[in-house]
Design a protein with these regions (language model features):
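ABC ATPase NBD coupling module
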Residues: 82-99, 117, 125, 132, ...
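A short, proline-enriched helix->beta-strand linker immediately N-terminal to the Walker B motif
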Residues: 177-181, 465-469
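Conserved ABC ATPase "signature" region
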Residues: 134-153, 424-441, 550-551
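Helix-to-loop junction immediately C-terminal to a conserved catalytic motif
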Residues: 61, 65, 357
Length: 559
């Protein structure tokens, strides 16, 4: 008897082929995809957008829409072909023996149900023999297992009352409700910050060790792959180009595409830390920047605050509660520099950037650009900020009007920006797209006809064509694949040098911030926790929160 017969794989995918049928004709999505998953194993599937990695997971789960057709191969679970099962058999399999964790925890949870009720509902759905009391007890146990504090009390809370990391833990609890044999985790940490990502990955690893569940981890992040996977499949254009143990993939990649992915991962450089506290603030969030000569300053933000008022329930019932998104945040931005803002979700970094750009109002404080002070309690159209500050947003697909051609989008930026009245808008647009590496043939297309990297280049061009004094870039690379990230970072650096641009660069990726920025502010819970030169923050700051962010970075890509 062979080793494979003694320890048969839990899941076997062999020569899987899929195509998508549309009025334009069939398109091959997957071609000859083969792999096995053992019991208690974590298998990583990595590749860029469009590689087919999520499609593999959906094929296993039986979640593909009718226009997808299987053209070849088989999918076997525990010795039985999944693709030969009836719809009822697949329904029984899904949730009970194979579960899924998806990227967007917000979309995975019902905002009108308490989180406990959602876990309890899943427990009842996968085990019809459970009483309501037993299902509630199991739901509380699951919330405790995934690390939700005070699960009995928080059982009654709604999704909006939890942090992003806690919501993802709740989604994991729901996935565990049926005691599955396999969890397919599709980009489960992509929307999370470094410290929260590390916590979620450690939780998945602990669950594998404790329960023996197998995990298929779909991601485009080599850092995630390096942290917890046992083996890796590298996919490109619907095919597996390389497969091996994780250590072999990371240390001895054979395929050029794998080498390209590894080379594109930004490295965080952390020299040996000293305990010196000069050249920056390490006293824990006074928010007061170091002195900079007034002649060198372009922007000064002083004691900017933002207070939110929201009801305790998502449908507007109950007394409104006040919470601070920002509390007395100050910043001094030297002319011609790039200043980074780093922080976890909910730290207030995007709120602050939107106030600087005139897209949100503040409840206190003031902003001065040059010699002009702006009333940030008013909207950007009323206080004059709009146009002087432009913003590059995180998701280019959302920030571009799908009904406008690229040329129309860029010309609109000229009409409403500081360069309004330009005698030849078409010439200005053509020069800009040339400089940003976009083909002029793309100008007649609409956003859905462009790749993610091309769309983000358009967003950069749109911001620059308005001739702003300051650009606020809010997570401009986090929605992009790692190789495209590297291209956009390189492009931004070239543009900053060429234009003499002043930029606020918002990110939770410390390696990119280190590469881009001359000074860095660390945000937490709406306050400035730490700040200083980039060299100080990454080499010499002894602030515990700053160190925790740095230590959360995958060690494989820290040097």
């Amino acid at each position: 008897m062979t080793v494979e017969q003694l320890n048969p794989p839990l899941l076997r995918v062999e020569n899987l082929g899929l195509r998508h049928v549309s009025p334009a004709g069939p398109t091959t999505i997957l071609s000859d995809v083969s792999f096995e998953l053992g019991r208690g194993e974590i298998l990583g599937i990595i590749g860029e957008s469009g590689a087919g990695k999520s499609t593999v997971g959906n094929a296993i789960l039986g979640l593909l829409s009718p226009e997808f057709q299987q053209t070849s191969g088989t999918i076997e679970f525990d010795g039985k072909a999944i693709d030969g099962m009836t719809a009822d058999e697949r329904e029984t399999l899904r949730g009970r023996r194979i579960s899924a964790i998806f990227q967007d925890h917000t979309a995975s949870l019902d905002p009108l149900m308490s989180v406990g009720a959602q876990v309890e509902e899943t427990c009842l759905a996968v085990d019809k023999t459970l009483s309501r009391r037993a299902a509630r007890a199991r739901a509380i146990d699951l919330l405790a297992r995934v690390g939700i504090p005070e699960p009995e009390r928080r059982y009654r809370n709604y999704p909006h009352q939890f942090s992003g990391g806690q919501r993802q833990r709740i989604v994991i609890a729901i996935a565990l409700a049926g005691s599955p044999d396999i969890i397919i985790a599709d980009e489960p940490t992509s929307a999370l910050d470094a410290t929260v990502q590390k916590q979620v990955l450690e939780l998945l690893k602990t669950l594998v060790d404790e329960t023996g569940v197998s995990v298929i981890l779909v991601t485009h992040d080599m850092g995630v792959i390096s942290e917890i996977t046992d083996r890796v499949l590298v996919m490109r254009k619907g095919q597996v180009v390389e497969a091996d143990h994780t250590a072999v993939i990371l240390d001895q990649p054979r395929h050029d595409y794998t080498k390209k992915l590894l080379a594109a991962v930004p490295r965080l450089r952390v020299p040996p830390t000293t305990m010196s506290s000069e050249d920056g603030n390490v006293d824990g969030g006074s928010g007061r920047p170091a002195d900079i000569g007034d002649d060198d300053l372009l922007l000064v933000a002083e004691d900017v605050s933002k207070q939110f008022s929201r009801p305790d329930f998502p449908w507007g019932l109950g007394a409104a509660k006040a919470s601070f998104g920002l509390s007395d945040v100050s910043m001094r931005l030297p002319r011609g520099t790039v200043t980074g803002i780093v922080g976890e979700s909910g730290s207030g970094k995007t709120t602050f950037g939107r106030i600087l750009a005139g897209l949100s109002t503040a409840t206190g404080g003031r902003v001065t650009i040059g010699k002009n002070a702006f009333d940030v309690s008013k909207s950007g159209r009323r206080n004059g900020l709009l146009g002087r500050v432009q913003m590059i947003f995180q998701d280019p697909s959302v920030s571009l009007n799908p009904r406008m051609t690229i040329a129309e989008t860029l010309e609109e930026s000229i009409r409403f920006g500081a360069s309004a009245g330009s005698s030849d808008m078409q010439a200005d647009v053509s020069k800009m797209v040339d400089r940003l590496g976009l083909a002029r043939s793309l100008l007649g297309r609409r956003p859905h006809q462009l790749s993610g990297g091309q769309k983000q280049r358009v967003c950069i061009a749109r911001a620059l064509l308005a001739r702003p004094e300051i650009v606020v870039a809010d997570e401009p690379t986090s929605a992009l694949d790692v190789s495209v990230q590297a291209e956009i970072v390189s492009l931004l650096k070239e543009t900053i040098t060429h234009e003499g641009m002043t930029m606020v660069f918002i990110s939770h990726d410390l390696a990119i911030v280190q590469e881009m920025c001359s000074s860095v502010y660390i945000f937490r819970n709406g306050r400035v926790e730490d700040y200083g030169s980039s060299e100080f923050i990454f080499s010499r700051s002894n602030h515990p929160y700053t160190r925790s962010l740095i230590n959360a970075r995958p060690q494989r890509f820290t040097c």
